[in-house]
């Protein structure tokens, strides 16, 4: 598959579940697009208020508000100033009214008129249910309101999975034994290898979300962390037909499905 160029993406709309999803999976893409003068808009479904393993340092009662502030600072480091927060409670996306959530995304799409929508694939990268649900919402909204726009799913490549398997086993970040995905190179529509100033910029953006990243950086070391976050990869979504699209439609409608 021929690789896409950043400028070919046009106006970019990212749709994610929690603050920091957008930075981990697409900070380089967003920064490059903004540097090229393109419009980039970010949508986050929740404030991530349940996202801490250290409640002493990051009190849960204040975490949602803190993560909202962190997300703005992180996006600002990438040149992104347009951020929509849907306000769902962290961990409850699968229990929300899917039709209403999709309607909200349709309204945002109608306003932004993106050329490219970026979100999780149906696997949710880590298998998190919020990630998988938001993928389904974004896919359904794309079909309704922006069928002519490109839909990109964030993914992990076989090379990335191989290189970092020991770290992934140590961190235990994947909630599904079939993850991470091992997308072959020929199926990758866009891969960004960040180095130099661009890698530094992504590191700054992630460090701005200290409630999520400070502990991890301290655990594995900044240089290793910087290398780990330096790959971003995306596949073109199958936007019509096929078992994968059927699974997405079932999840968007609230019907349980195994992906």
Whereabouts are the PLM-identified features?
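Active-site rim/loop-helix segments in enzyme catalytic domains that contact anionic ligands
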Residues: 1-113, 140, 144, 248
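Metal-dependent de-N-acetylase/amidase catalytic core
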Residues: 2-13, 91, 95-259
């Amino acid at each position: 598959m021929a690789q896409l160029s950043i400028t070919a993406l046009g106006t970019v709309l990212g749709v994610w579940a929690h603050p920091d999803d957008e930075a981990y999976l697409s900070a380089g893409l967003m920064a490059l697009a903004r540097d090229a003068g393109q419009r980039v808009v970010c949508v986050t479904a929740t404030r991530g208020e349940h996202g801490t393993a250290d409640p002493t340092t990051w009190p849960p009662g204040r975490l949602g508000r803190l993560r909202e502030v962190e997300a703005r600072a992180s996006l600002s480091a990438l040149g992104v100033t347009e951020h929509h927060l849907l306000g769902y409670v962290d961990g409850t996306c699968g229990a929300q009214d899917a039709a209403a959530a999709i309607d909200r995304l349709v309204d945002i799409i109608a306003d932004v008129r993106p050329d490219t929508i970026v979100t999780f694939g149906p696997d949710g990268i880590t298998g998190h249910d919020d990630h998988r649900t938001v993928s389904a919402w974004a896919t359904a909204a794309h079909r309704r309101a922006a069928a002519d726009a490109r839909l990109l799913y964030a993914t992990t490549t076989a090379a990335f999975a191989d290189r970092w398997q020991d770290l992934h086993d140590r961190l235990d970040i994947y909630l599904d034994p079939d993850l991470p995905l091992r997308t072959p190179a020929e199926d990758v529509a866009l891969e960004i290898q960040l180095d130099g100033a661009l890698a530094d910029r992504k590191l700054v953006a992630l460090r701005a979300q200290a409630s999520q990243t400070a502990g991890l950086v301290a655990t594995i070391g900044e240089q290793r962390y910087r290398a780990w976050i330096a790959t971003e990869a995306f596949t073109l979504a199958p936007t019509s037909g096929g078992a994968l699209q059927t699974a997405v439609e079932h999840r968007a409608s609230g019907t349980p499905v195994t992906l």
